[in-house]
Amino acid sequence: MAFTRRLLGHGVGLRAKHFAEHLAVEPPVDWVEAISENFMAPGGRPLAVLEKVRRDVPVVLHGVSLSIGSTDPLSERYLALLTDLTSRIEPAWISDHLCWGSHGGRYAHDLWPLPYTEEALRHVVRRILRVQEVLGRQLLLENVSSYVAFRASEMPEWEFLAEVARRADCGILLDVNNVYVSARNHGFDPYAYLAALPASRIGQIHLAGHSDKGRYLLDTHGEEVPAAVWELYAETVRRFGRISTLIEWDDHVPPLGRLVQESRRAAEVEAAALAALQQGALP
């Protein structure tokens, strides 16, 4: 089955701080992304807000607890809750992270990188296929930021990500900030990372901020998108074309209007990158 990219435009994450504004007016963005786990409980204000928002603009679900790379069995309870939420909300798509965050039945509430080995690749692909079978739809997997690497890795991260998407017949949620953060932390070329990815598999982009700790960059989602990430996003657009793009801001969350400004800037950067590309192609 081929992966079908759906273009939604430029959106923002749905955060509790902005619930009142979302209830009062139609969201001033093209679409919103909701953290799946925050809306799995039946009833309550969060779900009521999400149901209202989905009547106004498209919604996608983004999970943080699937732990697709863990050696623990997939949580059937979690998949059941996600299936129920999917049936209720009918999101444009569902995504999670290409990582692991649980072991021995305990969740660390963190997103740890995988060893990039053939064994890990086969393991992850089997689990993605199972999740897609349960959900009845393709999944998008996001590249995570990382600060350590496994000596056992047999291939670079970008090759692993591309091969996961090919073998599992799933999509890629390309987090441009995570590419930049990991590139700085591990010393690889972020532009070479982009060049190795299959364009047809990329279904969504994340943009976010990070903190410079001197010796390393920390993916905080607590600042505006920095210049270097905007530059990498422009290259992403030139290489892959228009892709649904979301602004992530999870810490020190500003007013909704500030997120909307960042989303509009993403639209401007995208338009400029495409215009420059077209201009360069003219005789």
From Swiss-Prot:
Pfam families: MbnB_TglH_ChrH (PF05114). It comes from the Bacteria. InterPro entries: MbnB/TglH/ChrH, Xyl_isomerase-like_sf. Belongs to the UPF0276 family. PANTHER family: UPF0276 PROTEIN HI_1600. This is UPF0276 protein Anae109_1558. It comes from Anaeromyxobacter sp. (strain Fw109-5).
